[in-house]
Amino acid sequence: GSGMGILLMLVSLALFVIGFTMGGLNYMITVLQARTRGMTLMRMPLTVWGIFTATVLAMLAFPALLVSAIMMTLDKVLGTSFFMPTILKAGEVLEYGGGSPILFQHLFWFFGHPEVYIVALPAFGIVSDLISVHARKNIFGYRMMVWAIVGIGALSFFVWAHHMYVSGMNPWFGFFFATTTLIIAVPTAMKVYNWILTLWRGNIRINTVMLWCLGSVSYTHLRAHETQPY
């Protein structure tokens, strides 16, 4: 892009990542070191587990976004060629050369797919706790739910290139990322069925909160807005 707007966007993006990293460190240290007496990790609310795992993901994923913003800024300001291949402009060969737009895609999606779970995992934790409260039952399989959250977070770093099947990526890499994409469905399904088993024979209060939670369960299971009944 041309003009000052792109440069300001890249600088603001870098500042955002730095600020988020500082806030994420604060949250991680609070969870690990400042819990109340008797509150072990395996007694924490699932909401806290979701936010904590999302924070760890952000601490690992956002630096890739920061690096890509810095590299793009250097391409724009100093004439480097991290992302610019040899191209023609008005019939003349640019000074830039040797870069790869695919590199930008990898850096972006290495951030971009864990970012999906940075958004989703806290919501999963909130839904888990609300279903438990409004079904008046302890959450079914608490430890399983914790490990499902952690497993989803870990696997989220091995599926990013499923956004890049048509980018010219090696087919064997595509096979690997397709396989990991299928595997990540396992802990997600564990969470959904644990929600259903928590609802089973529970003393359910049909109020606004529970209706939203039931909508979340059905949406996570059906994965389609068109089939969302709530």
Residues covered by each model-derived region:
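Short aromatic-rich membrane-water interface segments that cap or initiate transmembrane helices
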Residues: G1-V11, P101-E115, F177, T181
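Acidic, glycine-rich loop-and-beta core segments that form the ion-binding/anion-interacting portion
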Residues: G151, F157-H162, W172-K191
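Hydrophobic alpha-helical transmembrane segments of polytopic
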Residues: S12, F16, G50, A54-L57, ...
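Hydrophobic alpha-helical transmembrane segments
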Residues: V116-F124, A189
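Hydrophobic alpha-helical membrane-insertion segments
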Residues: T53-A69, Y219
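Conserved small/polar residues in nucleotide/adenosyl-binding loops
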Residues: T220-P229
